[in-house]
A protein has these predicted regions:
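Active-site beta-loop-alpha junctions enriched in small/polar residues
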Residues: 13-16, 43-47, 73-79, 104-106, ...
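Active-site pocket-lining/capping segments in soluble small-molecule metabolic enzymes
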Residues: 20, 115-139, 187-241, 246, ...
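Active-site mouth loops of central-metabolism enzymes
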Residues: 8-24, 70-82, 135-151, 228-242
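Glycine-rich, proline-tolerant flexible connector loops at the mouths of alpha/beta enzymes
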Residues: 16, 37-58, 104-115, 165-180, ...
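Conserved N-terminal beta1-alpha1 strand-loop-helix module at the mouth
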Residues: 1-42
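Glycine-rich anion/phosphate-binding loops
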Residues: 76-90, 117
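Glycine-rich, positively charged N-terminal anion/phosphate-binding segment
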Residues: 22-31, 49-66
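Conserved, mostly hydrophobic/aromatic
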Residues: 12, 40, 91, 159, ...
Length: 279
């Protein structure tokens, strides 16, 4: 899916969480498709059947209706090998050819961790054997469960060796962190295309959630933006989008392969950041 076509710009959306009817997401996809992203990825929950079905349904809708390739997120932390095989068969049935293979977040109450998968690399190997194009996640500030950047680099290298064709990174608010991580990847012999994950800050609560969930750090520029605009939602969002656009411009200038925009299902964010990517 990642061809030699210059700077890659892709979008991420999430499906309806508890509703088998995907119609509510169609207007969003209609709008995003006009931005001509290189692909649109669709998230899924950790083991939720409805979410997995909706991921497949939205990917099929993208495939059938737009000139854009879909990428289905695929987690394994609560899955048996049979469940993985069944979900892959469903994706094949719907003509989906691209998958982002993830271990997945630790499950909520009521779901148990599968003993059949410990690492994403195991899932990647299985999916690759079924003739899918596989993307892997990577973590410029290390995975929150790992904490060691050298170990994270080694895990990422193993994912590529298992069959991942390209890498999509977790968000970071620091371009320097992205570039340092990419340099370490290349020095470790990992030459797969790298897409930097970009998410603009929209609120203080959102930033706090990202720190808690992902362990991201806050560069001084972000701290100053939050301090200046935390009492004005509109101005904070505007400043957050401008900052994200400046990140994209820096990364593009420094030769990063591309960016992956976490749209949060907000078309105006996707539009602003795609414009920065295409300049």
């Amino acid at each position: 899916i990642i061809k030699q076509k210059g700077f890659v710009a892709s979008l991420e959306v999430f499906p309806p969480k508890n509703d088998l009817n995907i119609d509510t997401a169609i207007p969003l996809l209609d709008e995003l498709s006009t931005l001509k992203p290189d692909f649109i990825s669709v998230t899924c929950g950790a083991g939720g059947t409805i979410q997995s079905d909706n991921t497949a349904k939205l990917c099929a809708h993208i495939k059938e209706n737009y000139d854009t390739e879909p990428v289905a997120h695929f987690t394994c932390i609560t899955s048996t090998k049979q469940q993985v095989a069944d979900r892959l068969a469903l994706l094949k049935e719907k003509g989906i050819e691209n998958v982002l293979a993830l271990r997945g977040d630790r499950p909520i109450e009521g779901l148990s961790i599968s003993p059949e998968y410990t690492y994403a690399k195991e899932l990647i190997k299985e999916i690759k054997a079924e003739d899918f194009c596989v993307a892997a996640a990577c973590y410029p500030e290390s995975h929150i469960d790992c904490g060691d950047l050298d170990a994270e680099i080694e895990h990422t290298k193993q994912k590529v060796e298992a069959g991942a064709s390209f890498l999509i990174s977790q968000l970071s608010f620091s371009s320097d962190i992205f570039l340092n991580y990419l340099s370490k990847l290349r020095n470790a012999g990992v030459d797969a295309p790298f897409l930097a994950g970009i998410m603009p800050i929209l609120s203080k609560a959102q930033v706090e959630r990202m720190i808690y969930m992902c362990g991201v750090s806050l560069p001084g520029n972000i701290v100053r933006i939050l301090a200046k605009y935390q009492d004005n939602k509109e101005d904070l969002e505007k400043a957050g989008i401008e900052y994200a656009c400046s990140q994209i411009e820096t990364l593009k200038k420094e030769g990063v392969d591309g960016i992956h925009i976490y749209t949060m299902n907000k078309p105006h964010i996707a539009k602003a950041l795609m414009q920065a990517a295409r300049q």
